[in-house]
From Swiss-Prot:
Belongs to the NadD family. Transmembrane segments: none annotated. It catalyses: nicotinate beta-D-ribonucleotide + ATP + H(+) = deamido-NAD(+) + diphosphate. Catalyzes the reversible adenylation of nicotinate mononucleotide (NaMN) to nicotinic acid adenine dinucleotide (NaAD). This is Probable nicotinate-nucleotide adenylyltransferase. CDD domains: NMNAT (cd02165). One of its GO terms (molecular function) is ATP binding. It comes from Bradyrhizobium sp. (strain BTAi1 / ATCC BAA-1182). Pfam families: CTP_transf_like. Keywords: ATP-binding, NAD, Nucleotide-binding, Nucleotidyltransferase, Pyridine nucleotide biosynthesis, Transferase. The lineage of its organism: Bacteria, Pseudomonadati, Pseudomonadota, Alphaproteobacteria, Hyphomicrobiales. GO terms for biological process: NAD biosynthetic process. InterPro entries: Cyt_trans-like, NadD/NMNAT, Rossmann-like_a/b/a_fold. It is an enzyme of class 2 (transferase). PANTHER family: NICOTINATE-NUCLEOTIDE ADENYLYLTRANSFERASE-RELATED, PHOSPHOPANTETHEINE ADENYLYLTRANSFERASE.
Amino acid sequence: MRIGLLGGSFNPPHQAHRAISLFALKRLQLDRVWWLVTPGNPLKDNGGLHALAERAAAARKVAADPRIEISCLESVIGTRYTADTIDYLRRRASRLRFVWIMGADNLAQFHRWQKWQHIAAQVPMAVVDRPPRSFRALNAPAARALARYRLPEADAGRLADRAAPAWVYLTGLKLSLSSTGLRNPDGSWKSI
């Protein structure tokens, strides 16, 4: 089974998360996408972060597709770091083929993630274009360091079968929604 992993705070979850997941299911020929709702992002101020249970419940409503599953795995295993989560999944579910899915905004700062090289060496990655961040993302330190492992977009459907490091940059999905834009100044959520 081919599983896409979309990690995030989901504070709040929104239709762009759903659209990215449906896009990835099709373009990467995945069977499922798991939304990994993190207890907290180590690179962000988590002061306005809603309760994990609230974010997970909202994510279930937004996902609205049986192929998208919501998980609070990081809370269960006691981590906030993607590298730990991927190591855990690879040990516990070695028969599954995982692909890490992230937006271009995350690729632009991927070099700041704990053990980012380890993540890239453990699981193939799909980066979804987020205009106008494309140029910055593709010229970021991690993108340059991993450039030789980038596959042509036409090979996206075979990414889950590739050994890491391998990644693809997916274009064609133009979304401007962001969780930041859906939060009020007091941290409460606008209508999702």
